Amino acid sequence: MKKRKELNALIGLAGDSRRKKPKKGPSSHRLLRTEPPDSDSESSSEEEEEFGVVGNRSRFAKGDYLRCCKICYPLCGFVILAACVVACVGLVWMQVALKEDLDALKEKFRTMESNQKSSFQEIPKLNEELLSKQKQLEKIESGEMGLNKVWINITEMNKQISLLTSAVNHLKANVKSAADLISLPTTVEGLQKSVASIGNTLNSVHLAVEALQKTVDEHKKTMELLQSDMNQHFLKETPGSNQIIPSPSATSELDNKTHSENLKQDILYLHNSLEEVNSALVGYQRQNDLKLEGMNETVSNLTQRVNLIESDVVAMSKVEKKANLSFSMMGDRSATLKRQSLDQVTNRTDTVKIQSIKKEDSSNSQVSKLREKLQLISALTNKPESNRPPETADEEQVESFTSKPSALPKFSQFLGDPVEKAAQLRPISLPGVSSTEDLQDLFRKTGQDVDGKLTYQEIWTSLGSAMPEPESLRAFDSDGDGRYSFLELRVALGI
C-alpha cells in the first residue's frame, strides 16, 4: 500500500506540474475542454486537498534524488572513462602484439617460400632416387640374386639336406648291419670246416656202402653155393634112407646144422648192419640238406645285403649329383655354408663309399668262393657210383669174409668209426624244442642271436635236467670247440 501511495504521489506531482502551466491561460484551456470550468476548479481543489500531504513528501524525496545524482554522475563518468582508457590501452597492446605476430608470420612465409622453391628443385631428384631404389628393391626381390631365388634355393637345400640325412641314416643302419659282413669270414670258415667234414663223412659212407654191397653180393653167392651143396647132400641122402646110417653121417649132419645156424646168424647180423647203414645214410642226407639250406640262406642274405649296399651307393651318387647342380645355382653368400656342408657330407659319403666298396669286394670274393665250394659239394654228392675208385683193401676183406663166412664181427671192425658214428648220429630230442621257432627262442633266452653259439651248460640251464647226455651232442659238433651253432642244433634235432 505504501508503494502504491508513493506512486500515486509521484503521479500527482506530475499532474500538478502539468496543471499549473495551463493556469496561466485558463481561457484557452477551457476552450479546449468540454467540461465546465466549475467542475475543473472543484476537481482541482479536491485534488489539492487530497494530495497536499503527498506533495510535501515528494519534495523531500526529490531533493535526496538530486543529491544522489550529483554524486553518482561523476563516479559513473570516471568509471566509464577509466574503462575506455583501459580498453584503448588493451587495443594498443593487442595491435602491437598482432603486428609482431604478423611480422613473424611474414618471416615464416618468406622462409616457407624459399624452402618451397628449393623443395621444388629437390623433388625431381628425390623422385629419381625413389625410382632407383624401387628398381633396386625389385632386383633384390626378383633378380638373378634376388630373395625369391635365394628362398627357392634354400628350400631346395633343405630338401636335399633332408635327403642326405636320410641317406646318411640309412647308410649308418647299413654300416651297423655290416657287422654281419665283418663276421662273414668266421662263418665262412665254419662252413668250410662243416663242408670238409661232410665231404669226409660222405666219402667214408660211400666207401662203406660199396664194401657192404660187395660183401652182400659175395655173401649171396656163398649162400647160393651152400644151398646148392645142401640140396645135393639131401638128394644123396634120400636114396639111402632105408639103409642103416653109419656114425660118420650123423656127425656130418650135426656139422651142417651148426653151419646153417651160423649162416642164419650172419645173415641177421648183415641185415641189422644194413639197416644201421641205411639209417646213417638218411641222417647224413638230412645233415647235408640242412647244411645246404643254411648255405643257400646265407648266400641269399649276402646277395641281398650286397644289392642293398649297391642301391644305397647309387642313390647317394644321384643325391650328390642333384646337390652339386643345386649348389652351383647359389650365390656368394650361401657358398661358404654350402662348401662346409658339402665337405662334411662328401667326407662321410667318401668314407661310407670306401667302406662299402671294400665290403662289397670282400663279400663278392667270399660269395664267389662259397659258390665254387657249393658247386664242388654238389658235384661230389651227385657223382655216380661207377666213377668212384675201387678199394683193394675192401676186396681183401671180402676175400677173407668169403673164406671165413662166420667172421662177420671182423667186418664190423673193418667198417670202424663211420658206421658207429652213423649209428650215433640219430636225431636227439630236447625238451620244449620241436621247431626252428622254439630253437630261436632258446637262443634269445640265453641272450644270443642266431649267429651265436651255445655251450652244453647254457642249454642245460635253460632247458633243465631233462637234457640228454653231452656225448650225444658231441657227435654233432662239427667244429669240435664244445659250442653248438644254430645249424648244428637243427641237424641234431632233425628239424
Swiss-Prot record:
<feature type="modified residue" description="Phosphoserine">
    <location>
        <position position="17"/>
    </location>
</feature>
<feature type="compositionally biased region" description="Acidic residues">
    <location>
        <begin position="37"/>
        <end position="50"/>
    </location>
</feature>
<feature type="binding site">
    <location>
        <position position="488"/>
    </location>
    <ligand>
        <name>Ca(2+)</name>
    </ligand>
</feature>
<keyword id="KW-0106">Calcium</keyword>
<feature type="region of interest" description="Disordered">
    <location>
        <begin position="1"/>
        <end position="50"/>
    </location>
</feature>
<feature type="binding site">
    <location>
        <position position="481"/>
    </location>
    <ligand>
        <name>Ca(2+)</name>
    </ligand>
</feature>
<feature type="binding site">
    <location>
        <position position="477"/>
    </location>
    <ligand>
        <name>Ca(2+)</name>
    </ligand>
</feature>
<feature type="binding site">
    <location>
        <position position="483"/>
    </location>
    <ligand>
        <name>Ca(2+)</name>
    </ligand>
</feature>
<dbReference type="InterPro" id="IPR042352">
    <property type="entry name" value="EFCAB14"/>
</dbReference>
<protein>
    <recommendedName>
        <fullName>EF-hand calcium-binding domain-containing protein 14</fullName>
    </recommendedName>
</protein>
<dbReference type="GO" id="GO:0005509">
    <property type="term" value="F:calcium ion binding"/>
</dbReference>
<feature type="binding site">
    <location>
        <position position="479"/>
    </location>
    <ligand>
        <name>Ca(2+)</name>
    </ligand>
</feature>
<keyword id="KW-0677">Repeat</keyword>
<feature type="domain" description="EF-hand 1">
    <location>
        <begin position="434"/>
        <end position="463"/>
    </location>
</feature>
<keyword id="KW-0597">Phosphoprotein</keyword>
<dbReference type="InterPro" id="IPR011992">
    <property type="entry name" value="EF-hand-dom_pair"/>
</dbReference>
<feature type="domain" description="EF-hand 2">
    <location>
        <begin position="464"/>
        <end position="495"/>
    </location>
</feature>
<dbReference type="InterPro" id="IPR002048">
    <property type="entry name" value="EF_hand_dom"/>
</dbReference>
<keyword id="KW-0479">Metal-binding</keyword>
<feature type="compositionally biased region" description="Basic residues">
    <location>
        <begin position="18"/>
        <end position="31"/>
    </location>
</feature>
<feature type="region of interest" description="Disordered">
    <location>
        <begin position="381"/>
        <end position="404"/>
    </location>
</feature>
